[in-house]
From Swiss-Prot:
GN (gene name): ATG16
Listed InterPro entries: Autophagy-rel_prot_16_dom
Membrane topology recorded in Swiss-Prot or TrEMBL: Peripheral membrane protein
Function: Stabilizes the ATG5-ATG12 conjugate which is necessary for autophagy. The ATG5-ATG12/ATG16 complex is required for efficient promotion of ATG8-conjugation to phosphatidylethanolamine and ATG8 localization to the pre-autophagosomal structure (PAS). Also recruits ATG3 to the PAS. Involved in endoplasmic reticulum-specific autophagic process and is essential for the survival of cells subjected to severe ER stress.
Keyword field contains Hydrolase: no
Keywords for this protein: Autophagy, Coiled coil, Membrane, Protein transport, Transport
Gene Ontology molecular function: Atg8-family ligase activity; identical protein binding; protein-macromolecule adaptor activity
Organism: Candida glabrata (strain ATCC 2001 / BCRC 20586 / JCM 3761 / NBRC 0622 / NRRL Y-65 / CBS 138) (Yeast)
Lineage top rank: taxon: Eukaryota
Name of the molecule in the record: Autophagy protein 16
Main location group: membrane
Amino acid sequence: MLAERDTLEKNYCELFEVPVDGRSNDGDAMLLQEALRGKDNEIRMLEERLAVSSKNVERLNDELLGANLEANVLGQKLQDLQQEHDKLLERWMQRVRVEVDKMNAQLE
């Protein structure tokens, strides 16, 4: 029975250390509270940075979307101009062929 009591007391002391010098843990609690306040401030600052970063990402996505739209419009315009150029070149080549044929006919 005494051995059982000693074991219980030993386990209790391991779980709940009693300060030997009689000091309370107020100093430790204050240090921990100060550390907690510091971490809370750090969290708040990181949340603010995250919010700013999110706004920047949103703004950049909007700019990227606008640039993609502009690139698509310019790509279509380029394709249209290339088709027009090809048609004009074909008409010009046809005209030159006709003139060359006329000149050849006159020389014969």
